[in-house]
Amino acid sequence: MARKKISIIGAGNVGATAAHWAASKELGDIVLLDIMEGIPQGKGLDLMEASPVEGFDCHIIGTNSYADTANSDVVVITAGIARKPGMSRDDLITTNTKIVADCAKKAAEQSPDSIIIIVSNPLDAMTYVAQKASGFPTNRVFGMSGILDAARFKTFIAMEMGCSVKDVSTILLGGHGDDMVPLPSYTFIGGIPIRQLLPEEKIQAMVDRARKGGAEIVAYLKTGSAYYAPSASVIQMVEAILKDQKRILPVAAYLNGEYGYEGIYTSVPVMLGANGVEKVFEIELTAEERQLFAKSVDSVKNLIAVTGM
């Protein structure tokens, strides 16, 4: 059986680290593409040379040509400018709209049956741009957001509790930004509702920290943004697709009437498998949660309007 093929567009920190995670899991052969000559080639070769040490079998190449991405099963788009301190994800929209549209169009031409996953920011709007530019069905274009946001929330909970992160489960909704909606009502520690274990003020402090999780990393790094957790998050999605795992994960998916919204991308729980987003799950929300979700959706709508697509 032929190996699966994963193309990663953008060989910066997120793209290269995603390639590393994918290789270590032996998910398939990997193409790392970037417009900067030499960068993807060098990183691809460096990663390939790690394979005898770590014992993973896959072929990795770096390239500047979309022709090398032909017949990919999954295309991950990380290309675009990154945030600097004081910038929001939304500040990137004008530049990254052009970049993501170009990447999605070229990738779709080479791999018309592929699934496209967006990591570029502002994520929900860029996922919308990629779907329009590629012309793909909406179930085959979606974004990495909720997995990362939930991972941050779970990390802070485990740190507060002093427990294993493996025992923390949660879900969240909304855009990948300051208006995201972590859901303590769907958060459990070893199967126990979080509100039975922690006071409300501590829970809300962690909710706020999760919303600002990306900005916290940017403030520390000063010259870039997070890449270990974002790349691990997108490769969890790639694995679910290539192995047809039917995982229930929060991703930036297209809403077609679910939750009362139409024609936008935002993070909701979905079933992720070989066909991409195979089902969108509508969960019950309190009045306050619905209000917060509506605010988040409005923010996404405003960004989509700016793209002009």
UniProtKB/Swiss-Prot annotation:
It is an enzyme of class 1 (oxidoreductase). InterPro entries: L-lactate/malate_DH, Lactate/malate_DH_C, Lactate/malate_DH_N, Lactate_DH/Glyco_Ohase_4_C, Malate_DH_type3, NAD(P)-bd_dom_sf. Its EC number is 1.1.1.37. NAD(+) binds at G10, A11, G12, N13, V14, G15, D34, N96, V119, S120, N121. The keyword Oxidoreductase applies. One of its GO terms (molecular function) is L-malate dehydrogenase (NAD+) activity. Substrate binds at R83, R89, N121, R152. Coiled coil: none annotated. CDD domains: LDH-like_MDH (cd01339). GO terms for biological process: lactate metabolic process; tricarboxylic acid cycle. The active site is at H176 (proton acceptor). Keywords: NAD, Oxidoreductase, Tricarboxylic acid cycle. It comes from the Bacteria. It catalyses: (S)-malate + NAD(+) = oxaloacetate + NADH + H(+). SUPFAM superfamilies: LDH C-terminal domain-like, NAD(P)-binding Rossmann-fold domains. Belongs to the LDH/MDH superfamily. MDH type 3 family. Catalyzes the reversible oxidation of malate to oxaloacetate. NCBIfam families: MalateDH_bact (TIGR01763), PRK06223.1 (NF004863). This is Malate dehydrogenase. It comes from Heliobacterium modesticaldum (strain ATCC 51547 / Ice1). The gene is mdh.
